[in-house]
Amino acid sequence: MTHPDEKPWILGLTGGIGSGKSAAAKCFSDLGIDTVDADHAARWVVEPGRPALEQIAAHFGKGVLQTSGELDRGALRKLIFETPEQRRWLEALLHPLINQEIVSHLAKAKSPYAILVSPLLVESGQYRMVQRLLVIDAPAHLQIERTMLRDSSSQEQVEAILKVQIQREDRLRHANDVLVNDRDHAWLSSEVERLHHFYLTLRGGQS
């Protein structure tokens, strides 16, 4: 448990779509480690009533809103995939707000170390918040198969997402640790437990 006046030791956890980063994060959580998911923070900042949602609707038009007033993520995703400039505008708006949410939640961590789970850890600059970076990696064919199964997406849709995401080599270049998730869940769980004990050792060495 961290001391009230002590900054939490943060592990960054990232990986491409279909790599299994969420499954790995769940394994860490099952071991009692507090996790903050950047995707959840990204949803919080665009909830109805939040200023960011109003700015998005003003910029892209009411077509990105559902009848309930909530963000229509599918409509927005289509717009930003088709126009890189629009994606950059959206990132410039949301990334600082998301980072504020992340910092706030990480500060509340009570476990020996905390984990920031983010698919955009490297490209958003969020890696600067962490003391160590773990990349969950997987062969491209497995990423495609898993995502098609999970999201009922076509192969073309998944490949398009992979092209937009940061290049695998760039992600790996920032990594302190790499876990190649190409086996079953039991193996993944045992590898996470091994890393967990290693991180406890590192955390114990922090002043």
From Swiss-Prot:
Its EC number is 2.7.1.24. Coiled coil: none annotated. Residues 10-207 form the DPCK domain. GO terms for cellular component: cytoplasm. Pfam families: CoaE. ATP binds at G18, S19, G20, K21, S22, A23. Pathway: Cofactor biosynthesis; coenzyme A biosynthesis; CoA from (R)-pantothenate: step 5/5. It comes from the Bacteria. GO terms for biological process: coenzyme A biosynthetic process. It is an enzyme of class 2 (transferase). Keywords: ATP-binding, Coenzyme A biosynthesis, Cytoplasm, Kinase, Nucleotide-binding, Transferase. GO terms for molecular function: ATP binding; dephospho-CoA kinase activity. InterPro entries: Depp_CoAkinase (IPR001977), P-loop_NTPase (IPR027417). It catalyses: 3'-dephospho-CoA + ATP = ADP + CoA + H(+). Its main location: cytoplasm. PROSITE patterns: DPCK. HAMAP family: Dephospho_CoA_kinase (MF_00376). Belongs to the CoaE family. Catalyzes the phosphorylation of the 3'-hydroxyl group of dephosphocoenzyme A to form coenzyme A. This is Dephospho-CoA kinase. It comes from Pseudomonas syringae pv. syringae (strain B728a). The lineage of its organism: Bacteria, Pseudomonadati, Pseudomonadota, Gammaproteobacteria, Pseudomonadales.
